[in-house]
Amino acid sequence: MGLELPLILGTSSVFRREQMERLGIAFQAASPDFDETPMLGESAPQTALRLAEGKARSLTGRFPEALIVGADQVAWCDGRQWGKPMNLANAQKMLMHLSGREIEFYSAIVLLNTVTGRMRRHIDKTVVVMRQLDELHILRYLEREPDAVYCSCALKSEDLGALLIERIESTDPNALIGLPVFRLVDFLKNEGVEVL
C-alpha cells in the first residue's frame, strides 16, 4: 500500500527540498500551516519533535492519503534555543556570540502514513564546535553566503559555513542541513518505498 501513496515533504525550506531531491524519489513539497511558537519549559529535542509532528499533521487535510514527512531543527547553546537570524544584523550578532562555542543541533524527522495513522519519529543530535571568529570573517562569510540568514544559527554547513566549523560529531551528516536522511530512508523502507 505504501508504494501507492504519494510522498509529501512538509516544508517551506529550499534546503530540505534540495536534500530530498538528491534521493531521486518522486515527492511533492507543501508548506505546512502550523504555529511554530516555542513553548515555555520545552527542551530543544522536545521542540524539534513537536514542530516536526505538527508540520506533518497540518497537511493531513490537504493530503488525506499520503506519506507525509515533517522535519524541524532546533539549536541549543548557552542554556537557550537558537533559531534563524532572518537578517544580516541578527546573523552577525549570533555568529559573534557563538564563536568558539559548542552548539547542539536537534534535527527531528517524522513520517506520517495518513491511511494507517502510523507516525514514525526520530531525533538526531549533532554537536558542532565553532572556530574562533572575528567580525571581518563573519562579514565576509555573510557577504558570500547571504542565504545563511535563513539557516539555524546562520550556519550553512553544506557550503561556506563549513569554514566556520572546527569539529562536528554526528551519526548522520545530512541532519545538520535539516533532514536526517539516514533515518528517513529507513522509515520509507518500512512503508514499502524503496529508495534504491
Swiss-Prot record:
SUPFAM superfamilies given for it? Answer: ITPase-like
Q: Indicate the annotated site residue(s) for Important for substrate specificity.
A: F15, Q73, E158
For activity, the cofactor(s) needed are:
a divalent metal cation
Q: Which GO terms describe its molecular function?
A: nucleoside triphosphate diphosphatase activity
- What is its EC class? hydrolase
> What family does the database annotate?
Belongs to the Maf family. YceF subfamily.
**What functional role does this protein have?**
Nucleoside triphosphate pyrophosphatase that hydrolyzes 7-methyl-GTP (m(7)GTP). May have a dual role in cell division arrest and in preventing the incorporation of modified nucleotides into cellular nucleic acids.
What name goes with this protein?
7-methyl-GTP pyrophosphatase
